[in-house]
């Protein structure tokens, strides 16, 4: 991790902790009024709007974008990268494992994610890949202000 990324993650962890303590009930109430309580029984995922606006700029294909959104749904803790199985992503997306692998390879080749392999003996990850999103976070932080400026012109 770069020092800048650690700072961003530390700041976002601090801000999310402070804001979640202060407004967790308010934001949950807002989400429930928007989506309904039942729709949120499996939780919810926060995704920066910049990612949607930058999909075309970054040339992320629809399949790779879907894979990325599914990875984000598994990113629960700031310092713990998502590690879903490719098979579970394929089932959720109703595509083949190979299609998921192509989407992951695209994101990796673009430099947005870094795949880290684990051993089958690892007590937690059990051979699943860990998907490091550092580059995605840095890209969004670098590109979002520019896209916002362009949109407001």
What are these regions (language model features)?
Residues 1-99, 106, 126:
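Short recognition helix of helix-turn-helix/winged-helix DNA-binding domains
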Residues 14, 152-153:
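Short coil/turn motifs at helix boundaries and re-entrant loops, enriched in small/polar
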Residues 25, 96-151:
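Winged-helix/helix-turn-helix nucleic-acid-interaction surface
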């Amino acid at each position: 991790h770069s020092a800048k990324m650690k700072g961003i993650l530390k700041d976002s962890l601090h801000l999310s902790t402070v804001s979640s303590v202060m407004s967790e009930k308010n934001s949950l109430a807002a989400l429930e009024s928007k989506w309904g309580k039942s729709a949120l029984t499996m939780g919810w995922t926060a995704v920066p709007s910049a990612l949607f606006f930058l999909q075309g700029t970054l040339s992320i294909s629809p399949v790779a974008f879907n894979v990325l959104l599914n990875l984000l749904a598994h990113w629960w803790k700031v310092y713990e990268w998502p590690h879903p199985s490719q098979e579970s992503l394929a089932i959720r997306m109703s595509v083949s494992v190979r299609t998921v692998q192509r989407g992951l390879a695209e994101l990796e080749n673009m430099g947005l994610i870094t795949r880290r392999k684990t051993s089958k003996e690892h007590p937690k990850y059990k051979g699943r890949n860990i998907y490091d999103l550092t580059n995605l976070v840095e890209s969004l932080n670098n590109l979002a202000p520019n896209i916002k400026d362009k949109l407001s012109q």
